[in-house]
Every structure is written in C-alpha cells, then in structure tokens.
Swiss-Prot record:
<feature type="binding site">
    <location>
        <position position="19"/>
    </location>
    <ligand>
        <name>substrate</name>
    </ligand>
</feature>
<feature type="active site" description="Proton donor">
    <location>
        <position position="202"/>
    </location>
</feature>
<dbReference type="GO" id="GO:0004000">
    <property type="term" value="F:adenosine deaminase activity"/>
</dbReference>
<dbReference type="GO" id="GO:0009117">
    <property type="term" value="P:nucleotide metabolic process"/>
</dbReference>
<keyword id="KW-0546">Nucleotide metabolism</keyword>
<dbReference type="InterPro" id="IPR032466">
    <property type="entry name" value="Metal_Hydrolase"/>
</dbReference>
<dbReference type="GO" id="GO:0008270">
    <property type="term" value="F:zinc ion binding"/>
</dbReference>
<dbReference type="GO" id="GO:0046103">
    <property type="term" value="P:inosine biosynthetic process"/>
</dbReference>
<keyword id="KW-0862">Zinc</keyword>
<keyword id="KW-0479">Metal-binding</keyword>
<dbReference type="InterPro" id="IPR001365">
    <property type="entry name" value="A_deaminase_dom"/>
</dbReference>
<dbReference type="GO" id="GO:0005829">
    <property type="term" value="C:cytosol"/>
</dbReference>
<feature type="binding site">
    <location>
        <position position="17"/>
    </location>
    <ligand>
        <name>Zn(2+)</name>
    </ligand>
</feature>
<feature type="binding site">
    <location>
        <position position="15"/>
    </location>
    <ligand>
        <name>Zn(2+)</name>
    </ligand>
</feature>
<dbReference type="GO" id="GO:0043103">
    <property type="term" value="P:hypoxanthine salvage"/>
</dbReference>
<dbReference type="GO" id="GO:0046936">
    <property type="term" value="F:2'-deoxyadenosine deaminase activity"/>
</dbReference>
<feature type="binding site">
    <location>
        <position position="279"/>
    </location>
    <ligand>
        <name>Zn(2+)</name>
    </ligand>
</feature>
Length: 340
C-alpha cells in the first residue's frame, strides 16, 4: 500500500490537540502577531516545537507545549491556529476532525473561556468554507488545574453547542491527578449536556480505564495500559468503548515502550473499536498518512481495516446523527474504489 494511496483514503480523526499541531509557517505567523522572535531557520525552530523521538516521559513531552502557549493568547491567533490545523487535515483527505484545546492555556492576557472557544470555532468555520472537511471542537479541562477553574470554564461554554462545540475532555498529568479525583467535575460536564472523552491509561495505569468505564465514559484517548489486561480488554469490548489510539505519540512518551507493548493487536483480536489519531501533528512530527503507514508496516493493517476504523471514528464522534450519516456515505464511496 503506497503513501499516495494512504493519503487518498478518506479519514476521520477524533484525537488532535490544537496547540500541538500547528504547522511551522503558522507558528511563524503567530509569533509575528505576538511580537515574539523565533529562530531564523526551520531546523532550529523544530528543536523547540517537535519532541525528540524518545522523551523521558509524558511530562517531559508536554514541556514542548510551553513554547507555543504565548502564541495563542488572542482571538485572532486562536482563529488562525484552528484554521491551520483543519487545513492540514483536509490536505490529506480527512473529512471529519475533532480538534481539542484547553481554554485556560489561552487566558493569560484576559480572554475568557467563551472568547477562546468562539475564536477556535470561527477558525474551524473558515476552514470548512475553503476545504472539504467537517471540523468540530472539544474543550479540554486540565487535570492539574483547580476544580474552581474547571467549573468556571464549564459555566462559560455551556451555551456554545449550537456554534460547533461538541464535547469535553480531560487532559494533562494523569499520573498525579487520576480519573477518580475528577468525579465531581465529570458530573458537572454531564449536567452541562456535553458528551465526554477522557485521556485514560496513557500513564500506564489500567485502573484509570476501568474508572472511566465505571463513570459511563465510552471514548478514551490512548488506553495504552490495556496491554496484557485480558479481563479489562474484554470489558472494554463488551461495553462498546472506543479507543482513540495515537501510536507515534505513545512511543515518544514511553506510554508504550515498544511496538510489542502497544495494545493495538490485543484489542483488534478481541474485536475492540479502534480509531487512529495523530494526537499532536507537530510535536510528534506526524500526520494521519504517516500513522496509517506505521500500522501497515507493523501490524499488516489492510484497507478494509482502515474503513472500519474510520467508520468507528464517525460513529463515536460527537457530531449530529445526520452529519454522521453523510460522512459514513462519503467513507464508503471513497473506500469502494479501493476494495473492488
């Protein structure tokens, strides 16, 4: 299966972080907007915004994001950033993407949570007008933030669903702030009406995956801690949960120490619902075409598998049922030409 074919396949992505996915030209433009001086060469700039192939840990990997934070402190910057990430996705035939971001990381200079979300939604709308893509936004609460901060963000976004905000996630330091410490916040999100996904099992603790299932959350990011957990995998499959897998990122952060310790094959063999995602296009120096190529190389993934994974993504997405029907039809049309 060639790179060209993999690029042409229609794709849906559920797990993509805004601040970790900005293109280098976009980073330069945003820095100019913020009067921030960057290294003159892309080779030097890449050292600041792309994590090493092997980092010490997830916490080490997350340090890369501090370089981007000052660039995303205005409505104009957030709007352009959202447009840029959706544009990148559209250029590799991603027909649906959910882009997630943490409002509080863009509130250093006076923006409110609703200001940040509205700006991102405007950028996604700009991209949708120009490209063949449906782009929606998720808000991330940060696990390490105070509950008061997160509750205030939830209050500010409660009425933004009609504008394209479709769901909520908790990201950040999962090891120090486990899922069972977020129960009151998760209940608050549920009362707001937003469906949820959670980063779960990225730090090696399978209990966080079980805790998510106990809370009725059926979409989870990473789930690398499923490896070797036969009973939990069985439960994950039986409860119709969906895995947002991020191979390159997990190898970088050592969430998976090797291909052999990545849970894909076990989950696939058990009939689990798998989706393939970039996590952070720039920080991990990847895109969906590259991720698909890795699955072909390491797992022998076939085109018919990619169709199923993308159908899983659309069905598990937080967009409307009518939008899902349209997207599923587009997927089938695209893949039919390769499966005949």
């Amino acid at each position: 299966m060639t790179q060209a074919v993999l690029k042409e396949l229609a794709k849906a992505e559920l797990h993509c972080h805004l601040d970790g996915s900005l293109s280098l030209p976009a980073i330069r433009k945003l820095a100019n907007m913020a009067d921030i001086i960057l290294p003159s060469s892309d080779k030097e700039l890449r050292k600041y915004v792309i994590a090493p192939a092997q980092t010490e840990s997830l916490v080490d990997y997350l340090k890369t994001f501090e370089f981007i934070r000052p660039l995303l402190q205005t409505k104009e910057a957030l709007r352009f950033a959202a447009y840029d990430v959706a544009r990148q996705a559209a250029l590799e035939n991603v027909i649906y993407i959910e882009i997630r971001f943490a409002p509080e990381l863009s509130m250093d200079k006076g923006l409110t949570a609703s200001d940040t979300v509205l700006a991102v939604l405007e950028g996604l709308a700009d991209a949708q007008k120009e490209f063949n893509i449906v782009a929606r936004a998720l808000v991330c609460g940060m696990r390490q933030s105070s509950h008061k901060t997160t509750k205030d963000i939830i209050k500010h976004i409660v009425d933004l669903a009609p504008k394209g905000l479709v769901g909520f996630d908790f990201a950040g330091d999962e090891f120090s702030y486990p899922t069972d410490s977020l129960v009151d916040l998760i209940q608050e999100v549920k009362r707001s009406g937003y469906p949820m996904t959670l980063h779960a099992g990225e730090c090696g603790c399978a209990k966080h995956i079980a805790d998510s299932l106990n809370l009725g959350i059926k979409r989870m990011g990473h789930v690398t801690a499923l490896t070797g957990q036969r009973d939990l995998i069985k439960r994950f499959v039986e409860e119709d949960a969906v895995a947002e897998m991020c191979l390159t990122s997990n190898l970088q952060t050592k969430a998976a120490s090797s291909i052999q310790s990545f849970p894909y094959q076990e989950l696939y063999d058990a009939g689990g619902k798998i989706t393939i995602n970039t996590d952070n296009r720039t920080v991990s120096d990847t895109n969906l075409t590259k991720e698909y190529s890795l699955f072909v190389t390491y797992f022998g993934t076939k085109i018919e598998d990619f169709l199923v994974f993308n159908q899983n993504a659309v069905k598990a997405s937080f967009t409307s049922d009518s939008e899902k029907d349209t997207l599923l039809h587009k997927l089938q049309e695209n893949y039919d030409s390769y499966l005949k």
